Amino acid sequence: MSKTQRSDGDAGSGVVTAHNVGRTYYMGEPVHALQNLSLALEEGSFTAVMGPSGSGKSTLMNMLGCLDTPDEGTVEIDGRSVGDLSGAQRAKLRGTKIGFVFQTFNLMPRLSAAENVTLPMVFNDVVDEGRRERAQTLLERVGLGDRLDHAPNELSGGQRQRVAIARALANEPTLILADEPTGNLDSETGADIMDLFEELHDEGRTILMVTHERHIAEHAERIVHLLDGELDYIEEFDSAGVEDGGPKTAQPTADESIGTSGGDAE
C-alpha cells in the first residue's frame, strides 16, 4: 500500500476547499479539533475519511458543510469564503449547495417519505406545485416509488436511509456529505446503500463520506486517514482488479494535501 503525507498547506482548488483550517473548542482545557488542515474536493470526486473517534472527522465534515466556522484559515465553496457570509447566507448556501446523509437518518417521524423529501425544497422556496412531483421522482430514483406515503416507522432501516438520500438530493446539491451512512444497517443493506452512492458518483456527484469501516471506504476514489487529529496518510485508488473482483490498488497522492489537525469529540 502506498502512503503520502504532506503538510505544505497547498490544497489546490475544488468544489469545496479548506485552506489551513483550525478549530479549537473550549471545554475546560482547550481542545484543538483541527489545526492547519487543507483539503480540496474536486468536482465529481468521491472521498472517504477514516480515523478513530476523536481524530477530527466530524469537525472536518461540519466545516465543509457550513455547520461550523473555523477559528483559523478559510473554507471556500465554489470560490466563496464561508467565513465572510452571514448566518443566513451560510444557511442558504448550505441548503442549495450541500446535501447531508446521516447515520441515524434524521427523518421527521410524523411526515411521510415524500413530505420528508420535500422539506429542503420548502426551505429553499421551491414552488409548492413542483415539490411533490420532484419528491416522487427522487424516491423512484432510490427504489421507493411505492413508498411515497409511508411514515418512517413503516419503513425498514435501509428504506429510511434511501429516503434520507433522496432528501439530500432535493435541491440538486453540488456536494453530498455522508456521516457513517451504513452505520445503523446490516451488511447486506449497507452494501445496497453503497451501490446507490456509487451510482450517484457515476452520475458526477461530489461525495465526502465519513466511515469507520474499511470495506465501505474502499468504495471511494481515495481515503483520507486522520489519527489523533493529524493526517496519517492518504490513499488513492486506481481501478486495477476491480472489474474482475480483485482488490483496489492504492496509489500515492500527487496533488492533494492536508496539514495537521487536532482531535474532536464525535
Question: Regions from the language model: what does each represent?
Answer:
Residues 1-22, 232-266:
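ABC-family P-loop ATPase nucleotide-binding domain
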